Amino acid sequence: MAQARRLVLFWYRAYNQMMTDFNAKTRLFVDMPLVAQQRVTLPDAHRHYLVNVMRLAVGAPLTMFNGHDGEWAGHIAEISKKQCAVDISMQIKSQINCLDLWLLFAPVKKARLDFMAQKASELGVSCIWPVRTDYCRISRVKDERLAANAIEAAEQTERMDIAAIREFTGLFSVLDQMENDRLLIWCDESSAGSPAHNIAVALRAAPAHYKAAILIGPEGGFSPSERKQLTGRKNCLKISLGMRILRADTAAISALACY
């Protein structure tokens, strides 16, 4: 009888811990395998975030995802000066990936670039690709900064995959690498095409596609040679974002929201 009582108490406590883990408010991206009933040791950066920023202690619940295995519930099992260990209890969500949608853009200044990467990730792009155009004023882009913004946005919005970050590349090279069946949505600031409220209509009239890329140009627009290349490209849809010339970050959000 005593043994049965202890067994019931054990499962009762285990069930309560699982329910606590399931209702966790802290969500963390980790670059490691996630398996039920396993203990994982987090990198020091994660330990610092959980302990010093979030002020979590041993026993605190959290959820984790790695971008391809769904979402998992767990709790902090151990904290030391050098590491933080988490016990994984169970998978609570199956993996769901966003649409195969790329954002190609001429980079802008740092603060607006951070904003663009965050919002693009929140809106579900699968790839963030800064492109070098003839009139681009930025000469260098920090890939790791874009990646950090994409991860933070995914953590906050319950997205389960992470937008891929591609290296800063010339526009013509990007176009050469793009598949022919990927619809290129060219946001042309000088276009006399669809006004802002008809972008969705223009997209519905576009060729059938299951993957696409949205192209946003620099503040100075596209050069004549770039326009010639884009105009002659197969499977390219030129659209207007309205009567006004939008900043690159505003244009990106507008186009993504309409897709």
Report the location of each language-model feature:
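A mid-sequence, solvent-exposed acidic-amphipathic segment
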Residues: L171-P207
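A C-terminal functional module that forms or caps the active site or interfaces directly
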Residues: A212-Q229
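Short, acidic/turn-prone active-site loops that include or flank metal/cofactor-
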Residues: S191, E219, M243-L246
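RNA substrate-binding interface of SAM-dependent RNA methyltransferases
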Residues: K93-W186
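N-terminal positively charged helical leader segments and presequences
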Residues: Q3-K93
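Short, ordered loop/turn segments at secondary-structure junctions
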Residues: P33, Q91, T133-C136, M243-R244
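Structured adenosyl-cofactor binding patch, chiefly the S-adenosyl-L-methionine
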Residues: P224-Y259
